[in-house]
Amino acid sequence: MGRGAVIFADSRTASFKALMPGVSTSLIWGDTVKGPYAGFTKFAPGFDAGMHSHTNDVLLVVMNGAYLYKDDAGEKRVGAGDFLRIPGGHKHWSGGDAKEGALFYQET
C-alpha cells in the first residue's frame, strides 16, 4: 500500500509485533526504518521510553489509555481522542499510563 492508496486500518484486528519490551506496533503504510510511515503503537502499562528524540516530526492520536509526555516545559497526560505533534529533534520522555498503557496512531 502506498501513500496514494485509500487505506482502512482497524486497530482491533491489526497484527501487532513486539518492537522492544513494552512496545508493539502494527505498520499501516511506509517503512519504519527509512520513513515516512504510519501505524498503531501500543505502550504496555507503565512503559517508560526514557528521554529521546525522533529524526522527523511525529504526529499521534491517542485511541485508548493515556500517552504520558514530558519535556523541559512540563508533563502532559495525552488521553483518548487527543492529538500531539512532536517536532523532529525535540528531546522528550514518553511512556504509558500505569494502569491502561496506551494505544495510539502514529505518523511521521
Q: Which residues fall in each region the model found?
A:
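Extracellular/periplasmic catalytic domains that process cell-envelope and extracellular macromolecules
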Residues: 19-20, 32-34, 53, 77, ...
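A short, N-terminal "cap"/entry segment at the start of jelly-roll beta-barrel domains
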Residues: 1-35
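Ligand-binding loop in jelly-roll beta-barrel domains
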Residues: 88-108
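Conserved short histidine dyad/triad with adjacent acidic residue
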Residues: 29, 34-53, 87-91
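Short acidic-glycine-tyrosine-enriched beta hairpin
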Residues: 32-33, 67, 71-91
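Residues that flank catalytic or metal-binding motifs in active/ligand-binding sites
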Residues: 24, 55-58, 63, 90, ...
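Conserved hydrophobic/aromatic beta-strand scaffold that supports enzyme active sites
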Residues: 25-27, 38-42, 59, 75, ...
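Glycine- and acidic-residue-biased ligand/ion/polar-headgroup-sensing regions
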Residues: 44-47, 54-73
